[in-house]
Amino acid sequence: MRENSWLSYTEEDDKNVEVLAQEYKEFLSKCKTERECTQYFIKEAESHGYQDLNKLIAQGNRLKAGDKVYGVGMGKTIALFQIGKQPLTEGMNILCAHIDSPRLDLKQNPLYEDTELSFMDTHYYGGIKKYQWVALPLALHGVVAKKDGTVVNVNIGEDPADPVVYVTDLLIHLAGKQMEKKGSVVVEGENLDILVGSRPLAGEEKDAVKANILRLLKEKYQMEEEDFLSAEIEVVPAGPARDCGLDRSMIAGYGHDDRVCAYPSFAAMMEAGHVDRTSCCLLVDKEEIGSVGATGMQSMFFENTVAEILALMGQDSNLAVRRALARSRMLSSDVSAAYDPAYAEAFEKKNCAYFGKGMVINKYTGARGKSGSNDANAEYLARLRRIFDDNKVAFQTAELGKVDYGGGGTIAYIAALYGMEVVDSGVAVLSMHAPWEVTS
């Protein structure tokens, strides 16, 4: 077993860890959706000299070694590049992570009233234990796109003066039959509706509580009920990330999966000096539901962005794109399950991740015989071992859990379709996919 890194830290290391942890907690507390993450990264990148790719294309500017550029996909995914001295066709060093997290999404017609209580209907996003999302203070984050083209940002429940919303649960005194159900159905997905009001609007004879909610939304966001049809509003745990443990050695918060990988990947790009080989940080959406859609890893966004960059370097050919991608090397950063002694039966101790033992390398993920995994090449792993050891980087190797106990997938296999070297790597997490997760 690897040494606990806390034991080898110097006083300066401890200070650096504390600084990074504080910055990360601020990010995690503010950025709870893929849109919010992307906007944060754009602002920070521009302050570090990165330029918008679309503006460079419009101006016909050429790219050269040392230039920094970013491309954005529909406000939900972002790719950042620092051009190296070597030709881009020799490949890139890529850090990739996802910025979506499990949550509840409002349906397109969400608002209703029942017995003078007003609710909003939701559809859960990603793999969740549905019973974990009841009886918690929740917040609303998202956007409302109106017919006139304006887009209104929604954020309710994060300011201490804000109200929160809530999914009700059945009191234990009446829950005899409920407690006999399997965990997967003890709370049904269709019952994950958020309670948003109970005060009727004076003068309204029908659905007066709902009418009052609509009045409040119109006052604050100038929106009508029909505007829900073109809204993307996510229901997430309310409140900031917190230090966890009496020794403050851990962080509890929403969205560690996968922002605990996305944030340091981005930070590494911002701190990088001049590079010989082009560096890239790719932060994508929709991983939790299969990397689908125009902003997921299965889309053409990344390939198209690389093609545009090559064109600005005078290499406007399909072959150049293929060579640049095939000769790249990627760390596909996603969280790994940390060993939990309370559920020891799910883990194989020799091949699992532990807090304090360094970043986690997963040669493969998947389930039922590695199905759906990338399975990194031994030669690539040897190369990474040498780099990590030469630079005194603490790392460990792990599988998700015991064979045939379950499994999971990442974006690694999708990137590997280009022929590049890819390995899963990331951070160990306790209570993965819960509303509040814990990392070291």
Placement of each model-derived feature along the sequence:
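N-terminal hydrophobic/helix-forming segments and targeting peptides
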Residues: 1-440
